[in-house]
Each structure stands twice: as C-alpha cells, then as structure tokens.
A protein has these predicted regions:
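Phosphate-proximal small/polar/acidic motifs at interfaces that engage nucleotide phosphates
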Residues: 136-137
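His/Glu-based metal-binding/catalytic segments typifying zinc-dependent metallopeptidases
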Residues: 75-133
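Charge-rich, well-structured scaffold segments of protease-associated domains
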Residues: 1-76, 111, 119, 141-271
Length: 271
C-alpha cells in the first residue's frame, strides 16, 4: 500500500506508473484486451535477445529468424509520464487493526547514466543497502523497532527513486522515521571511519564479483548494462569507484542528495 501511495504521488494518476492495479481492472479484463495488447507490444523491433552458453551459429540464426517474423511498430509502449515535483510531503493512511506500520521515505533522483550514480550507490549501501548498514544498526539493533529495514535507488526510464522502507512495530512509526533521519544527518556531518569504510568496500567488491561469477549471473548483469547503453567496461569503473571513494565524498553526496526537506514520508498503519 505504501509503495502504491508513493507511485501515485510521484506520477500522475491515470498513467501506467501512477495507476495501481485494482480489482476492477482484473474483472474488466477480456481476451480482446489481451490480444490487442499483444499485437501492440510484442513487436520485432522491440525485442532484444540475450543468450549465453555453448550456442551454435545455426541456433542463433533460428532464434533471430523466428522473432523477425513478428510485425513492427513505432508506437511507444508506455507514453511519456509527467512527474509530480513537490518534495517533502507527508502522507498518512491509517490502519487501526494493523499490528505493524509501514514507513516509506522517498525522493526522485537522477538517471542511470548520471556521473554520481556509482558513488551514490556506495552511499546508499552504507545507509541501508546491506545487513551491516547504518539503518540496520540503528533501527533494528539499537532501537528494536523492526526486523529489517533497507534503502534502495531504483532506476526507472530517465530518473530514479531513492527510498527507505520498513515494517515497524505498532506505534513506533514516527520514532522509526526520526531514527532514519538521524542516520542521514550523521552521514552529512560525520566522516565514515576507516574500519567501517574498509568493511563497506569489501562487501561491495564481493557483491560486484557475485554479479558475474557464473554465466547466468553475468548475463543478467549484461542485460542491465545493455538497457542503459553500457558495456563490460562498467565493471572496471565500479571497482575504480570503490577504490577511490573517500569519506569526504560520501559526506558531500549525503548533503547534496539527502536533505531532509526534499524527502517525502509515508506511514501506513498507526503513528
């Protein structure tokens, strides 16, 4: 529910990204709707084929020839979506019988090819991107408000959405949100120590290596690179960023992108 409220608030209601799936959408769906959608979307010029493994040339030719038989279309699959630019909003949807409350903090950020993307990923990982993150230590271990909390920067078309999300115990939503902002403030005012930075770099290096440690993982990673116009050189750039990242850079990024007044908050459940 919190995610739906976020999307409705970022995108215009009635657009594909801003319209949550409702029961009546499914009830009103017909075979004709599905056929029309299939004809509009499943077009030869919209298909990228990725294959990995011991594949012969004749197999590749057969696959390509098969999909080339589909028709072609220049009609956009998803129309251009307008973004709501208001920041720092508060949305509350009560659920009186809920035993937990969902908190969601979010803001719109840059696209995948932005120059700060790799360094911001390191900042995000430190804040809430792995089990030893600041948010896990604060909101879970120290405060005991939740079993799990995480942050992510999700890339969509020409922008991204940074968010922090967690299900917290009843009546502790406000305290949990304040704890999140306390950790963001620490990132903006205190440089990360050498030991914590070393642990963070080790974790990220391992995560990047796991993303290409077998043929299936490598293909998934390559598909993502291809989607955003990148290639195998991206892996080298990721490791170069890990090597050169400094406490000063992390502090600067936190101040540049995570100012409290720009972050919207959602609570679903009880305060």
């Amino acid at each position: 529910i919190a995610s739906q409220l976020m999307l409705k608030n970022i995108y215009q209601l009635g657009t594909p990204l801003g319209t949550p799936l409702e029961r009546e959408h499914i009830e009103n769906l017909s075979i004709d709707n599905l056929k029309e959608y299939h004809q509009q979307v499943f077009q030869a010029n919209r298909i990228n084929i990725f294959a990995a493994g011991n594949i012969e040339d004749d197999e590749t030719h057969t696959i390509v020839q098969t999909f080339q038989q589909l028709s072609k279309s220049s009609t956009p699959i998803i129309p251009t979506t307008s973004l709501q630019t208001q920041e720092g909003q508060f949305i509350y949807e009560p659920r009186e019988n809920s035993l937990q409350s969902t908190i969601l903090l979010y803001k719109k950020l840059f696209d995948y090819n932005h120059t700060d993307r790799r360094e911001f990923n390191i900042l995000n990982t430190l804040l809430g991107g792995y089990f030893g993150s600041r948010l896990m230590q604060k909101v879970r271990e120290e405060c005991g408000y939740t079993y799990s909390i995480y942050s992510e920067n999700s890339y969509i078309c020409d922008h991204s959405i940074f968010f922090i999300e967690s299900d917290v115990i009843e009546g502790k939503a406000d305290e949990s949100i304040e704890a999140c902002f306390e950790e963001i403030k620490r990132l903006q005012t205190e440089e990360i120590g050498d030991e914590e930075l070393s642990t963070l770099k080790t974790y990220l290096s391992g995560a990047y290596l796991r993303s290409v440690d077998c043929i299936t993982s490598y293909m998934k990673t390559y598909v993502r690179w291809h989607k955003f116009g990148l290639n195998e050189e991206e892996m080298g750039q990721l490791f170069a960023t890990i090597k050169k990242i400094s406490p000063q850079t992390i502090l600067s990024l936190a101040n540049r992108y995570l100012q409290r007044e720009t972050i919207s908050t959602i609570i679903v459940g009880k305060h």
